[in-house]
């Protein structure tokens, strides 16, 4: 029996907001001068008419996914909007339709299906099915090709390009304005939070370099399309990522390509969704014939498709940029293994480059919203700790502990699982983004480094979301 009176009891108390009639976004109505006597008729099927001297059908009010992304009404639960557009069900539907078109010989309508796999969800699936990372990658490639994939790619080339662009952006910013802290941009949960909560104050701090997912989208829809001799709109590009926020990122208007007349990434699924797809078929990853991942970018393939970037599990931005900046800006060499010093908790750490008692560089890694909020508040108060660069990730422990990674199956604590995934990650060979593959991509596709084309396709912009001052967002 409830110990609260009926008048005081609250129900459905949670922070998850799904699309419904309770959407708080006010609809803009274009008003025109009307004469007396106009009449609006609403029929049983929802048809609207305005009659005066004749009839005119009124426009239907629509709230789109883009409205939800551009609305300040909710932050943490916009993923609910994407249930139909960014789901395993939609993916399987597209794959079935494509197989039917192939069988009918309707080649003009057949789409080239491309999957891109990020290393973090692959680690999660490798642990789940007790496989090495290489084995998991090859079995997953076999599974996806059986579903209908034409190409199964890794994110290595995009990871490398993101590091190269971000480090150059930092050096340029440092030389122009050393006082402005630069914050990483690869985490869409963090970017969405910054746009909706802190707006124009924090956005100038965020790097403009696109995330590896969106760089991969450009390469698939433009470079791969060019190599295949097809339009980018005839490619259906799916990414497998460690968190649901990547679905939001793929849906941003900034990542709709006028060149290909399509989104750079059409669908995002996650490690946990891959597990659910396998469970629905009562199968495991090991049951599928192993296949090699594809490498369509350069004539010579890399030694391995799966690499680690520095020692951090979220792309290695802070460590790589620190090493590069130390050499480029101050001609200082750094150790191969950098030692970040943990501060109040293991999710906030820093490193300094000092010479003759003077701090030349001060970088940090901030994972989890508690640390992000503390960092932003210090910047707002003008009491920032003097970091020139901060690698920011919304999830505690970073991308390896993304919200859509496979859950522990034996009552294991998430922290213990994360540590095991970190150990798997450390077994991977280290990637140096300065390699023959990135140099060839820059030369052949981007017309060189630091060009207008590379700036357009490898960078993006951010948009402060205006706060909605409306009583519609108050629920009593």
UniProtKB/Swiss-Prot annotation:
Whether Ligase counts among this entry's keywords is no
Q: What are the recorded GO MF terms, alphabetically?
A: 4 iron, 4 sulfur cluster binding; metal ion binding
Gene3D superfamilies hit by this protein: 3.40.50.1780, Fe-only Hydrogenase (Larger Subunit), Chain L, domain 3
Work out whether the entry's keyword set contains Iron-sulfur: yes
Q: Name one GO biological process term.
A: iron-sulfur cluster assembly
Q: Which SUPFAM superfamilies match?
A: Fe-only hydrogenase
The UniProt record gives the binding positions of [4Fe-4S] cluster 2 as 187, 243, 395, 399
Positions binding [4Fe-4S] cluster 1 in this chain are: 23, 68, 71, 74
User: What keywords appear on the UniProt entry?
Assistant: 4Fe-4S, Iron, Iron-sulfur, Metal-binding
- Similarity-based family: Belongs to the NARF family.
Function (record text): Component of the cytosolic iron-sulfur (Fe/S) protein assembly machinery. Required for maturation of extramitochondrial Fe/S proteins.
Q: What is this protein called?
A: Probable cytosolic Fe-S cluster assembly factor GH10760
């Amino acid at each position: 029996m409830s110990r609260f009176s009926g008048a005081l009891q609250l129900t459905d108390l949670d922070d998850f907001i799904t699309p419904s009639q309770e959407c708080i976004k006010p609809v803009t109505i274009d008003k025109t001068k009307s004469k007396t006597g106009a009449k609006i008729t609403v029929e049983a099927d929802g048809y609207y008419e305005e009659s005066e001297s004749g009839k005119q059908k009124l426009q239907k009010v629509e709230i789109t996914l883009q409205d939800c992304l551009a609305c300040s009404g909710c932050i943490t639960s916009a993923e609910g909007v994407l249930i139909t557009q960014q789901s395993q069900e939609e993916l399987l539907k597209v794959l079935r339709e494509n197989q039917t078109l192939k069988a009918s010989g309707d080649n003009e309508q057949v789409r080239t299906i491309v999957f891109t796999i990020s290393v973090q969800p692959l680690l999660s699936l490798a642990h789940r099915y007790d496989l090495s990372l290489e084995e998991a990658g090859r079995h997953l490639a076999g599974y996806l090709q059986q579903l209908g994939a034409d190409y199964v790619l890794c994110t290595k080339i995009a990871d490398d390009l993101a590091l190269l662009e971000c480090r150059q952006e930092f050096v340029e910013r440092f030389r122009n304005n050393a006082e402005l802290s630069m914050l990483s941009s690869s985490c869409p949960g963090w970017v969405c939070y910054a746009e909706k909560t802190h707006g124009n104050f924090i956005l100038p701090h965020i790097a403009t370099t696109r995330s590896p997912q969106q760089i991969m989208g450009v390469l698939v829809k433009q470079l791969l399309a060019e190599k295949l001799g097809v339009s980018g709109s005839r490619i259906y590009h799916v990414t497998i990522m460690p968190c649901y926020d990547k679905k939001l990122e793929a849906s941003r208007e900034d990542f709709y390509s006028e060149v290909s007349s399509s989104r750079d990434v059409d669908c995002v699924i996650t490690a946990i969704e891959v597990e659910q797809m396998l469970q629905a078929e009562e199968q495991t990853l090991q049951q599928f014939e192993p296949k090699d991942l594809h490498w369509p970018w350069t004539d010579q393939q890399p030694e391995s498709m799966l690499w680690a970037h520095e020692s951090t599990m979220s792309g290695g931005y802070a460590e790589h940029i620190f090493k590069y900046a130390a050499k480029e800006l101050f001609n200082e060499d750094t150790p191969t293994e950098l030692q970040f010093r943990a501060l109040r908790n293991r999710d906030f750490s820093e490193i300094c480059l000092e010479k003759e008692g003077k701090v030349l560089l001060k970088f940090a890694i901030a994972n989890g919203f508690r640390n992000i909020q503390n960092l932003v508040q210090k910047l707002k108060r003008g009491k920032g700790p003097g970091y020139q660069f901060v690698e920011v990730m919304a999830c505690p422990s970073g991308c390896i502990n993304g919200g859509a990674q496979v859950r522990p199956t034996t009552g294991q604590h998430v922290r213990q699982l994360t540590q095991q995934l970190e150990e798997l990650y450390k077994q991977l060979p280290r990637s140096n983004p300065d390699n023959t593959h990135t140099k060839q991509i820059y030369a052949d596709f981007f017309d060189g480094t630091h060009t207008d084309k590379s700036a357009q396709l490898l960078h993006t912009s951010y948009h402060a979301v205006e706060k909605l001052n409306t009583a519609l967002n108050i629920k009593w």
